[in-house]
A protein has these predicted regions:
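A glycine/threonine-rich phosphate-anchoring loop and its flanking beta-alpha core
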Residues: 1-70
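Short glycine- and Lys/Arg-enriched binding-loop motifs that mark or flank ligand-binding interfaces
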Residues: 3-4, 13, 18, 44, ...
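A generic hydrophobic-helix recognition signal that picks specific residues
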Residues: 19, 26, 106-107, 196
Length: 227
């Protein structure tokens, strides 16, 4: 409801990576019914929350704070709270896509946490983790990487960990190999001239795009998120 429903990206996975084959096709209308969420198992609700948390990181500190303050109500499917975060997430996604439909630059920020997440999904053959669970680990990894890149302090890492734990999202990946993850990351669809463009956190609510992340920093993060 809050992510792929808006934006027009249509893609399929390949054995070499996630969403590597695709196109753009804008729908005429997107219908969202919060009542549908009542039909989902808890694991899927948790997975969807990962994408909402992402929007707080990349675009809206107030959304991030609201999620932290209302985690219990959201997990209990309080419709008033859900309506706020779902609508705000869609507004953010639409605003970004409106400015950069084909991902020439700005739209890449929507991939915050997804470089690592896609690698985890690929390494585990898309069977061990839901997309949202992998994104949860990826968000934590992206904030760690931002910290090691000296962009955010250790308190931001702590706040990130606490929020992800409130929504019962995993912070570490099982059945993954660091070297394999590093290889998959290098094939990321955002890579240009062999350099991966990382989405890094400048502060909660603001991110930057950088290809100046060192191999040592990446491997340090991967070692920290793999168990």
């Amino acid at each position: 409801q809050v992510d792929s429903s808006v934006g027009g990206k249509v893609a399929i996975n390949h054995e070499l990576g996630k969403n590597l084959i695709g196109s753009f096709y804008q729908p005429k209308k997107v219908l969202i019914d919060l009542k549908c969420l009542e039909t989902l198992p808890k694991r899927e609700i948790i997975s969807g929350m990962a994408e909402i948390i992402k929007y707080g990181f990349i675009y809206d500190q107030d959304l991030f704070s609201y999620l932290s303050a209302n985690s219990q109500q959201l997990m209990a499917l309080n419709f008033e709270c859900l309506a706020k975060v779902v609508s705000r997430s869609c507004e953010i996604k639409a605003d970004v896509v409106r400015q950069d439909e084909k991902e020439a630059n700005l739209r890449a920020i929507l991939n915050f946490g997804h470089t690592i997440a896609h690698a985890i999904e690929s390494n585990t053959k898309y069977k061990l983790y839901t997309h949202g669970e992998a994104v949860g680990i990826g968000l934590y990894g992206a904030v760690l990487l931002s910290h090691y890149h000296e962009m955010v302090d250790v308190n931001t890492v702590r706040v990130t960990k606490e929020l992800l734990e409130k929504f019962e999202l995993p912070l570490q990946a099982k059945q993954c190999n660091v070297d394999t993850l590093f290889e998959i990351v290098g094939r990321d669809k955002k890579a240009v001239n062999g350099k991966v463009k990382w989405i890094l956190l400048a502060e909660i609510g603001k991110v930057i795009i950088s290809d100046q992340v060192s191999t040592e920093q990446i491997k340090k993060v991967l070692h920290e998120i793999v168990v």
